[in-house]
């Protein structure tokens, strides 16, 4: 699976996105050229089409992502594919039309604009039909041979079965040849010393080293020979990261964290990220200020108490800051016990609407402007919960290496909550983000977030409560 700025992206998605980008980009210049056929007019300045074609291509790919057209878990029929693609293209072309009204360099002639749409849209639809058929025909599962039979090996086998990636485990080898009876779906094929002939028989595409004890047992010569024959050799943490988008905290050797790539973003990445945070936050605050004033008035009229909810959260390097949200619960919610699974009576009428639309998060833009938070990063933890998590979750404080965010990798991967179990899972996603932090990954997370807000009702990642009375309750996160 190839990596884009450190983030794993399936090859079939890269080819689809590249093809779609080429179609949209080329359609703009086709739209500029076609009006010239049969006419004695001055040839257009082709350089003038570069900026709008680049922006339009970015918009189409972004809207397609928001419409879940790059979601490998989905298998749309032709009717739904056509509907989603129509929404994505219409939205993208409307945005470029509005941008062209304000920015001269993004303006397209009306005929070029229409010709671009009527050529790019059907071509993209046809591309997706052909691409879907070709990938379905060539989606042979890649064979994986596991070295090891312990907990780590079993976890990798379970992860492969649960994933939608094109892998299948053909068997495992261990030190004594007693790697299992197939009860977990994986049979033992012999000992580690049998790697040479087992590889010739099973012809694995990938050998995953999942040995919990390697000293004196790792068949180095046979592994090198397999690598020379073209077989991929993967250490199990890297393979797990590739499949899940997580760093496996529980079984990880400390040395892996020390020597693994990543965990140190380039200075230009940090500066660019901060610049984007400031520009986007300032623009959104200005544009949404009328909405925020209306929300503030509605909160005050709906229930007595302050407009904003403030809570101490842990920021980068453990610095405490006050996080802002629009208040969505009664002002006395701090002292009332959390309800059972029934709807929380402490949430106000306006609060329910704010939570459903995530508008209660808007004031956190001020935290971003002040430098306490970023648009993207691990969610800031409530200070009162940190001691418990620090004691029970390994490597927990490593998530403080970057600024917390309004949204994050864990949230778009459907992980939210304040129990130790949820926090453990969130940490694995957070560490993946910290290891592979890039502007590309930030943009991907923001697009995922927009998709969730627009198309997912009651998503668990932002179901929040503002003030628990016990550390195991969920909270305003």
Question: Over which residues does each language-model region extend?
Answer:
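A short, structured surface patch at a secondary-structure boundary
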Residues: 342-403, 445-453
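Membrane-cytosol interface motif
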Residues: 85-89, 140-159, 306-329, 349
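Loop-to-transmembrane-helix entry motif
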Residues: 49, 85-89, 275-286, 357
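N-terminal hydrophobic signal-anchor/signal peptide
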Residues: 1-23, 27, 75-77, 126-289, ...
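Short, glycine-rich, amphipathic interfacial segments at transmembrane boundaries or analogous
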Residues: 167, 177-181, 240-253, 307-349, ...
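C-terminal terminal-structure detector
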Residues: 348, 370, 393-477
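A hydrophobic, helix-centered structural microdomain
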Residues: 268-333, 367, 444-477
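Signature of alpha-helical transmembrane segments in polytopic membrane proteins
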Residues: 1-139, 474-477
